[in-house]
């Protein structure tokens, strides 16, 4: 009994006695919290909307106390630039919550310091413009296959369903080719998600893609034990109910199969003293495994980093393309402008990265999609590695930092009619250079999205192939398609139906 009371007393002191961090952060505005829990229970299940609401009340720099974790939320283009560009070294590290230590902090997203730099450099060596361009045929083939399957699945009224799921199939195949190479398990199978007679391989692929979506949804929830460790049993119950661990196991099993397949191949080549000749590129897993075999990184980093890349590349890009298509369907005049620009300026099927400059309106549509839908609305949190001043407020070393990309992309301070889809804002506006800088959907600073260049090329190529060959329209023109996504770690586009017609 005495030990229990003593333990309770120590815990209470731990939460109630002001720390160095809280003393420094005390002048930052924010909502008044409760003892021990702080502001945790003032954040509802829709974390993104809660963060947005606090921004509207307290401004671009505000403080939250989440259990025993001091947190500062940064919003607004100028605030994010001051923080992650001009003070980039103060915010380069990730704040690794307990729920993110599922990979022991050895993956490319959650690692820090020199080890993270090694993982990042390995990836970037495979993302040169020339190597990205070399994926054109594979991307184009997957886009055409997906579009053909959509067209074949239309009913008598030319209506197709499950568009977002088909997008995810396509992106899963593209990311498998990028990460694991042409011989990756499943990557050469069809995309037809509407076929009821799929073989076992396609059924397993469907299950993997479903697990990716559900994993992202669960990961976007608030895990209370990240901030109050004693609540871990309750979180574990909820995570089990939401299949968090089951989904993660499905993903790691798939990645492990492909990684071990490539490792065996590399070992065979090394044993036979075989060297590759004349290859323009390596798969991502091959690049990581070579560094593992040289003793530069741990095998766990190969597995977890490939899992990171597969997750992020599949779900975020698929949802971006799905939202883009929704906007083109709801705004048919914009879709026709994109089509006319493509057929006028791109005469052949060879699409390079530089061809984006020939299609400014198409690029404006893509930028507007990134702005309006903010696929990664809060990104992953950062760690403040030293005391720093932002917008006149002192932020203490050790503070968790959140990039509020969602509110920054929808603030009336930076955008006219921020909730409307207006690509022309990137073309007609006199201050176009400033507007281009305002696209923060890939994050800012040293920890911005490492796959940005590949994603931009892949999205551009997909839009060109789809809109050049097909016209998409609303089966019920008087009822616009739903443009509001489901919030999680990424914004998920709801499935929708559309009419599809081949262009003449």
Swiss-Prot record:
Q: Where in the cell is it found?
A: Membrane
Q: Give TM segment ranges.
A: 1-21
Q: What is its main location?
A: membrane
Q: Name one GO cellular component term.
A: membrane
Coiled-coil spans are none
* Alphabetized UniProt keyword annotations: Heme, Iron, Membrane, Metal-binding, Monooxygenase, Oxidoreductase, Transmembrane, Transmembrane helix
EC number(s) from the headed UniProt entry: 1.14.-.-
**GO MF annotations for this entry?**
heme binding; iron ion binding; monooxygenase activity; oxidoreductase activity, acting on paired donors, with incorporation or reduction of molecular oxygen
Gene3D superfamilies, per database record: Cytochrome P450
Required co-factors:
heme
Q: Which top class of enzyme applies to this chain? A: oxidoreductase
Q: InterPro entries, from UniProt?
A: Cyt_P450, Cyt_P450_CS, Cyt_P450_E_grp-I, Cyt_P450_sf
Q: Does the keyword Oxidoreductase apply?
A: yes
Give membrane topology per the record. Answer: Single-pass membrane protein
List positions binding heme.
449
Family, according to the entry, reads as follows: Belongs to the cytochrome P450 family.
> What name does this protein carry?
Probable cytochrome P450 513F1
Organism listed in the record: Dictyostelium discoideum (Social amoeba)
Name of the gene encoding the protein in the UniProt record: cyp513F1
């Amino acid at each position: 009994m005495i030990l229990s009371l003593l333990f309770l007393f120590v815990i209470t002191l731990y939460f109630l006695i002001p720390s160095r961090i809280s003393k420094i952060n005390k002048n930052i505005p924010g909502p008044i919290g409760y003892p021990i829990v702080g502001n945790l229970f003032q954040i509802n299940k829709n974390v993104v909307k809660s963060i947005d609401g606090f921004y509207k009340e307290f401004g671009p720099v505000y403080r939250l106390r989440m259990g025993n974790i001091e947190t500062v939320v940064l919003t607004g283009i100028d605030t994010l630039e001051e923080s992650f560009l001009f003070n980039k070294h103060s915010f380069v590290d990730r704040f690794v919550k307990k729920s993110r230590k599922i990979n022991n902090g050895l993956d490319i997203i959650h690692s820090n310091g020199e080890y993270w730099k090694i993982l990042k450099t390995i990836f970037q060596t495979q993302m040169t413009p020339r190597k990205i361009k070399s994926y054109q045929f594979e991307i184009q083939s997957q886009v055409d296959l997906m579009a053909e399957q959509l067209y074949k699945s239309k009913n008598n009224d030319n209506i197709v369903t499950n568009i977002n799921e088909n997008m995810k199939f396509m992106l899963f195949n593209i990311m498998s080719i990028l990460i694991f190479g042409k011989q990756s398990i499943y990557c050469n199978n069809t995309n037809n998600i509407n076929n009821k007679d799929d073989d076992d391989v396609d059924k397993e692929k469907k299950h993997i893609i479903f697990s990716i979506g559900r994993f992202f949804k669960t990961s976007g929830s608030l895990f209370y034990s990240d901030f109050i460790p004693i609540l871990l049993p309750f979180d574990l119950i909820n995570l089990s109910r939401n299949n968090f661990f089951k989904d993660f196991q499905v993903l790691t099993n798939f990645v492990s199969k492909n990684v071990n397949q490539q490792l065996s191949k590399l070992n065979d080549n090394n044993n036979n003293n075989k060297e590759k000749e004349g290859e323009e590129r390596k798969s991502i897993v091959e690049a990581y495994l070579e560094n593992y075999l040289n003793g530069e990184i741990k095998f766990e980093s190969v597995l977890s980093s490939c899992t990171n890349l597969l997750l992020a590349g599949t779900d975020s890009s698929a949802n971006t393309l799905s939202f883009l298509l929704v906007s083109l369907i709801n705004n048919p005049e914009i879709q026709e402008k994109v089509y006319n620009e493509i057929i006028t300026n791109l005469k052949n099927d060879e699409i390079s990265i530089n061809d984006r400059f020939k299609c400014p309106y198409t690029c404006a549509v893509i930028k507007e999609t990134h702005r309006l839908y903010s696929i990664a609305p809060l990104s992953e949190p950062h760690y403040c590695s030293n005391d720093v001043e932002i917008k006149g407020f002192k932020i203490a070393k050790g503070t968790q930092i959140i990039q509020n990309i969602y509110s920054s992309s929808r603030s009336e301070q930076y955008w006219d009619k921020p909730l409307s889809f207006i690509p022309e804002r990137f073309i007609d506006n006199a201050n176009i250079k400033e507007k281009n800088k305002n696209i923060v959907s890939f994050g800012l600073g040293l920890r911005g999205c490492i796959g940005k260049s590949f994603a931009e090329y892949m999205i551009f190529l997909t839009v060109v192939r789809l809109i050049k060959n097909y016209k998409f329209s609303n089966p019920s023109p008087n009822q616009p398609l739903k443009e509001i996504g489901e919030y999680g770690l990424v914004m998920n586009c709801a499935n929708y139906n559309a009419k599809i017609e081949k262009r003449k």
